[in-house]
Amino acid sequence: MCIRDRFKEEGLNREVLRSWIGRKILTELSKTIKVPNDNNGIEIYNTIENLLEEKKEVSTLDIIKAIPSEEITLDLDNLILIISSWKNELAMQQNLISKLNNLEKINDETPKKSDDNYISEFTKINKKIYASHRVKPLEVELWKSNKTNQNKELIIFMPGLGGEINNFKWIGNALIKRGWPIVFIDHRGSNLKAITEVLEEGQSIPGSADFFLYRIKDLEAVLKSHENGEFGIPNNSYILMGHSLGALIALLYEGNKPTVQLEERCDSAFKDFAVTNLSKLLQCQISEIPFSEKNNANKASAIIGFNTFGSLVWPKENSSGIKTPTLLIGGTYDLITPLINEQFRVFSALNNPSNRFLIIEGASHFSPIRINNSYEENNDVFKISESFIGSNPILVQDLSAKFLVKFLENIRDQEVTRVIKNQKDLGLNFHLLDLETIKEVSKN
């Protein structure tokens, strides 16, 4: 493992070393590379700091050679455990694809795009919401139909960590045409601007307050504005939608709050550096957040989550307490929040028979993110390699839009969305599954 490659590629180098995530990684590294009287990894930390001053790349071997100790012990059992976890994750992914391809084909009719009743005229409004947890006002972008007879629920969309509103306007376009108003939240402190400042200006990496506390309070402020009629929508109903961290915030807001057992589960999860499931690094910071005891009286009409995570928060079936109809969307090429060990577990923690999981083969964690229409020029701060994007993201987004619109329409019509197995549309293999089938394909 090349540490400099990992840190430098993410643009986090020294900032990561000094962050909560860096401390966790170093603690686990010190369990494999053991230095006498250095249980907290201080010697390893200082060694990496010094090496990064001198070298462009720092490998594990570089660290071992540079540690100022005559005696170093390598825990081979721990190394084998780490390697085994990687192999197991890959094997599970390959086994899942095989099981999906062996599903009996059911329902070959995918939702059709229709120009009927499309709304062509709508308004985009940049609004500022003053909230006590923010020094500067919260910024949101509201999309509303110009027709006055629309009475659909307000959709609230939350981007993931380092995301921005522009990445998800394809969702806004699909929904506003069908009459749904949508508000996009710009979460200052964990948005694209904040991560850019970390990567390019050496600012401190955001912490748990930015990741969770302020995001939840942002959502509360938006909902309060909606209830007070500040968006000009003639109801107080809402639908929550988000990508990755944004989806987790939606679930945290609507569901049971984390318990004291979260910290214990996190200690166990870090035995393999959590590198096979990077979302664990974020989930385990939730234990630092003080959650309100009261539950929100008004509930979402639906939840839509892309590349969702939260398996450490709700590890058991039905443990989330969420009975809201939910559609989760994920891909078989997601290496950040793997389907079997992360997204499927979150899905099983939900509790509504109409819930559905859209699996798109070849789609990755980054597939919902639209940088531009062609992807030929990637000016995104993360410079995501094509090898990590997976199948054509525009097609993945178009297919996702079809199904999320159909899911929401079915809820309004009080219809249950049909299960679809082993079908193809837009050149993509996909499956729209219920919990029973998810359990079936998840079995070892």
Regions found by a protein language model. Name each.
Residues I322, L328-G330:
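Short beta-strand/loop motif that positions the catalytic acidic residue
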Residues N151-G160:
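Short beta-strand element of the alpha/beta-hydrolase
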Residues I97-Q150:
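N-terminal cap/lid segment of alpha/beta-hydrolase-fold proteins
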Residues S204-G232, L248, L252, L262-N277:
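Alpha/beta-hydrolase active-site loop
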Residues M1-D5:
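Conserved small/polar residues in nucleotide/adenosyl-binding loops
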Residues G160, M241-A250:
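Gly/Ala-rich beta-loop-alpha elbow adjacent to hydrolase catalytic centers
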Residues G232-S244:
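Alpha/beta-hydrolase fold nucleophile elbow
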Residues G162, N166-K169, N173-K177, V183-L213, ...:
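Cap/lid segment of the alpha/beta-hydrolase catalytic domain
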